[in-house]
Amino acid sequence: MNIENSLKELGLSNHNIGTSTGSNYFSDGEKISSYSPVDGKEIGTVSTTTFEDYNKVIESAQSAFKFWRTVPAPQRGEIVRQFGNKLRDLKEPLGVLVSYEMGKSFQEGLGEVQEMIDICDFAVGLSRQ
């Protein structure tokens, strides 16, 4: 799998919004470019966060925390399990992106994604204690 196909499968484009609350996206900040150390090519651009948008994200996160802490641990664990499954589904394109963006081998990129999957599995186990 090449980087172009991986970016497409991950839903990434030439320009991406860098700030989100999960339901709201903010793109008013300046754009910065990400370059691959592999070949020096631009991978894409991302919008930075303005001070005002940052405050909105923090407020949203604080509000979400107040709700999230009331959700029973097994239900939270189920959501984390779904995250882990999505990471499993996208392991190869994520591994390609990590390797290209960080200048790592493909196997190292896959290893980085596997670590995220393992953390999700660990958290699911904790939710059942």
Regions found by a protein language model. Name each.
Residues M1-T45, E78, Q82:
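Terminal low-complexity tails and localization/encapsulation signals of metabolic enzymes
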Residues I43-Q129:
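Glycine-rich loop-to-alpha-helix module at the N-terminal edge of alpha/beta enzyme cores
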